[in-house]
Amino acid sequence: MKEEILRLLRSADGYISGQELCNRFGVSRTAVWKAINQLKEAGYEIEAQQNKGYRLMAAPDLMTEAEIKSLMHTDWVAKEVLYFDTIDSTNIKAQELAEKGYPSGTLVVADKQESGKGRRGRSWVSPSGTGIFMTLMIKPDINPNNASMLTLVAALALSLIHI
């Protein structure tokens, strides 16, 4: 619910009433208040005005699960997001999750990797605060010989977004 509240606050032109949030999610005002407070504790500046509702004033410069989910507008990619401050390797974690049956499109993100791996098993230095370290778990219906091309296609797609 936090991610959805954050998404609504981001897209709103003004205030969103607490009652509107209650109705939308089928929860009590207390549940909405708790979710808003959790967002505030995470660094979001949310203004609350009596008889008006809530308004997002500023977002922290942080990468969190709620932040990532609130910015994703997709049918399958990152519907499931797992965020870690520190992890051995996002790739190893994604492999573990795949074995547990997590769906295609699961995104594993970390601020720091202690044993990050790059292409061909090379060591990937990934200290805190220096990048976005992630593994997108996909189960494509392609020939395994073509799987190595997916990294190139993803990099190209991301570069085109910033042009």
Q: What are the roles of these predicted feature ranges?
A:
Residues 161-163:
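Conserved small/polar residues in nucleotide/adenosyl-binding loops
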Residues 2-157:
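N-terminal lobe of the biotin/lipoate ligase/transferase fold
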